[in-house]
Design a protein with these regions (language model features):
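Fe-S-dependent hydro-lyases/dehydratases of central metabolism
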Residues: 1-401
Length: 401
């Protein structure tokens, strides 16, 4: 039971009664099974979850145990350990590969089998090797690395394959950056994305397992000496530029500077991919002291990130205030929100057709963020910020002092 973690994060802050009921069903299941790690939306174990629309969408409506987006919460709560295997009922489970785990998404039937037997039959995937060299230039982010890679191989180019990232460039990336890259392996069809273990990995894992009292022993995995690759490439991080994945799939790559004529209706920053503290800090650096000119929505991935943004100060002003003063609609209700559309009252959802949104999220198939007639363009938090200021796709390098 201590190997099972249940984190409600989709369709939480909505008046949709069936969505609310799902949380109550989870609570009853976790109680019946004696599951220690259920991160409930409310504190009352005998209560019922009901979103109160009269309070609006911006004010916090969750209890002390709520964890937010599962993929971001798992490392924060000390549930990720190098060398282990993680199965999750969401395709972006591969984000945990940043921590030297074999992590992949599975369906509900497989999840039931895992919970009942502790086993699952999977094929060993072939490996695609991405050696990263150099370092990212100002205005270029980890999101640009993975958008570049997917643009090279296509949105099905890694189907049932492992995407392995290593080299000096990978070693130079922060854990947040590695999470962004590993997270989007699935957008190329990847079975998983994985990074090598190093001191950065160990430091975060050790800190978080100690803080949360979770299992702290682990054995990292290393490359086999005779490892072979079905694809082998080197990416010079210093040569990358701000990149956009265009509607209708993550493989439609263009450079931001090539798209500056394209007008936008809204901007969105959030999700497991683009809603981490470092993502919001990068966004705030661009918009600081200025004002966005299109509807811009901000959804931190977890309550911890909400706290970070409200307590981190720049020149005596919280980053949260810097963002709201710039016109960003920030919600304290951390979660998946409009990254995957959701019920019509979901914060940031595109309910009208014909709208174009630039987003720091991870997926842009038709209907992903709401209306099937809307279009989603994926970019880094910095590129989303610059574009929110400009009202059209913009290169963040022009906005950084």
């Amino acid at each position: 039971a201590n190997k099972i973690v249940i984190i409600p994060d989709h369709y939480i802050f909505t008046s949709d009664s069936l969505s609310n009921r799902n949380v109550d069903i989870l609570r009853e299941f976790a109680k019946a099974q004696g599951l220690q790690y259920f991160y409930d939306v409310i504190d009352d174990e005998g209560g019922k979850w009901k979103f109160d629309a009269s309070q609006g969408l911006l004010k916090r409506q969750y209890g002390s145990r709520y964890a937010g987006v599962c993929h971001t919460a798992l490392p924060q709560k000390g549930h990720l350990r190098p060398g282990e295997i993680l199965f999750g009922t969401d395709s972006h489970t591969c984000m945990a590969g940043a921590f030297n785990q074999f992590a992949t998404g599975i369906g509900n039937t497989d999840a039931g089998f895992v919970m009942g037997t502790g086993k699952l039959l999977i094929k060993v995937p072939e490996t695609m090797h991405f050696r990263l060299e150099g370092e990212l230039q100002p205005g270029v982010m980890a999101k640009d690395i993975i958008l570049h890679a997917i643009g090279e191989i296509g949105f099905d180019g890694a189907t049932y394959r492992a995407m392995q990232f290593d080299g000096p460039g990978a070693a130079g990336l922060s854990m947040d950056d590695r999470m962004t890259v590993a997270n989007m392996a699935i957008e190329a069809g990847g079975k998983n994305g994985i990074f090598e273990y190093d001191d950065k990995t160990g430091a975060m894992v050790d800190e978080r397992t100690k803080l949360n009292g979770t299992k702290s022993d682990y054995e990292p995995v290393e490359r086999d000496s005779d490892e072979t690759f079905v694809y082998d490439t080197t990416i010079d991080l210093g040569a990358l530029e701000p990149t956009v994945a265009c509607h209708p799939d993550p493989g439609q790559r263009k450079l931001a500077r090539e798209m500056t004529g394209m007008k936008l209706d809204r901007a969105y920053i959030g999700s497991c991919t683009g809603g981490k503290t470092s993502d919001f800090l990068a966004f705030a650096e661009v918009v600081r002291g200025q004002e966005v000119c299109i509807d811009t929505f901000g959804v931190p991935a977890t309550p911890e990130i909400v706290h970070d943004l409200q307590t981190t100060e720049w020149d005596g002003k919280s980053v949260w205030s810097i963002l709201t003063d710039a016109g960003v609609r920030m919600t304290e209700n951390a979660g998946c929100s409009a990254c995957l559309g959701g019920p019509v009252d979901t914060f940031g959802r595109m309910n009208e057709g014909g709208q174009k949104c630039i987003s720091a999220t991870n997926r842009n198939f038709p209907g992903r963020m709401g209306s099937k007639e809307s279009e989603v363009y994926l970019a880094s938090p910095a590129t989303v910020a610059a574009s929110a200021l400009a009202g059209h796709v913009a290169d963040p390098r022009e906005y950084l002092n």
